[in-house]
Amino acid sequence: MSFPEEKKMKKLPKYRQIVHFIKEKIGNGEWPIGSKIPSQRTLAKDFQVNRSTVITALEELMADGLIEGTMGKGTVVINNTWTLMAKNSAPDWDQYVTSGIQMPSRKIVQEINQSESNTDLIQLSKGELSAEIFPLAVMKEMMGKVSQHMEAFGYEEPKGYLPLREALSNYLKTIGINVSSSSILIVSGALQALQLISMGLLQRGSTVYLDQPSYLYSLHVFQSAGMKLTGLPMDNEGLLPENVHLTRGERGRAILYTNPCFHNPTGILMSKKRREEILAVSENTQLPIIEDDIYRELWIDEIPPYPIKTIDKNGHVLYIGSLSKTLSPGLRIGWIVGPEPVIERLSDIKMQTDYGSSSLSQRVAAEWFTSGHYQQHVEKVRQQLKVRRELALSALETHLKEVATWNIPKGGFFVWIKILPSISMKLLYTKALSKGILINLGSIYAQEKGNYIRLSYAYASLEDLQKGIYELGLMIKELASR
């Protein structure tokens, strides 16, 4: 739309602006036939009008034969300006988008993902460091250094930028993992590591054993590749390995995923003894392990036990690390450590997928490690997280003591809060969102028993953190009194 047209549109009544907006989306092919249009609530919020204005606009579009409201399905596009005049209809894109290999996220997860970018909301569950902690000045310095020395901006070798892999090899030695750069693959975040494993190492019908609850249940990485998830119970020391019982058919068709340091979502830190027990089960059953250790550096009270990979002498463990939680998710830099044949296989798949992670990001990451700034940064992050954790725990004690219980995490981002069983969690989620607070319910992580919330003390400003917990306490008490 040109600037004069934009000015003209702003002079129209609000309902006409909504009509024009929807017609433009349909006419441009952005919302093809079968597409579900935004809800009345969303449109009212976006255009800053009441719902009656939105209803007026939708009624006009229905009269024009462009949209149709169906009970239980919302309002969908049934025609476009071409098909009203032409004999040939557009492809049924709705059928296509429901036929892809990748399974869609649950509706509540999609809503959370969209809402996490809304700066008007208090993000009480977001698993990311606050902008208040982000080292902007040092990041600019690192990027400046990298840009001065770059002679080209092409693809890197399949396993990733060699100086970064060499820097990671040195870094990993500090936590007891002795590997060469040839056993390290650079990936675009830990999630891509899991996707590569699902595509390259497991066949359809394989079993993925994992902690339950788990962050993995909010995704469909393995299920979309035709695998099934089998949850294993946890206690306060982590996953209970005695519950791993491989059938004869699962040997060679199963893998164990675990998140031992400051587990997402429970915050549990796996004990040294439990790590040894899990590796023993792995060795006895020939069950490979995926060790997702992205929160390791975020310890607050004491240094965590060494990774399982440290005591793995026979190549049973694939170790995943990342800068997304400790430095910046925007860099999209993570790594997998494993036996060389596995790394060769995964690097080949990665090349077929995206031809390598960002060259610029890899160079910036290498600069963080080789300059010594990374270790200085994570020490500051730990100090900030300690302040935030104490603030959150104090606010919880003040405002939720009567209606909830929780753990005290030794590091990471999360407090796992158990709410009174009488509370409707769906109603609490909706009520919180209407008051400008976004929370992640335990159900999205396959927490089957009890009412849980994953609370993050890492992202919201200190003021919003206190305000959000205060409001959450009021809402829970109100629902409990009904």
From Swiss-Prot:
Alphabetical list of InterPro entries matching this protein: Aminotransferase_I/II_large, HTH_trans_reg/aminotransferase, PyrdxlP-dep_Trfase, PyrdxlP-dep_Trfase_major, PyrdxlP-dep_Trfase_small, Tscrpt_reg_HTH_GntR, WH-like_DNA-bd_sf, WH_DNA-bd_sf
GO term, biological process aspect, one: alpha-amino acid metabolic process
GO molecular function list: DNA binding; DNA-binding transcription factor activity; pyridoxal phosphate binding; transaminase activity
The keyword Transmembrane helix belongs to this UniProt entry's keyword annotation: no
Keyword annotations of the record: Aminotransferase, DNA-binding, Pyridoxal phosphate, Transcription, Transcription regulation, Transferase
Domain spans labelled HTH gntR-type: 12-80
One family name in Pfam for this protein: GntR
DNA-binding region: 40-59
The UniProt record lists the keyword Transcription regulation: yes
N6-(pyridoxal phosphate)lysine: residues carrying this PTM: K325
UniProt cofactor(s): pyridoxal 5'-phosphate
Family of the protein in this entry: In the C-terminal section; belongs to the class-I pyridoxal-phosphate-dependent aminotransferase family.
Name recorded for this polypeptide: Uncharacterized HTH-type transcriptional regulator YdfD
Gene behind the chain: ydfD
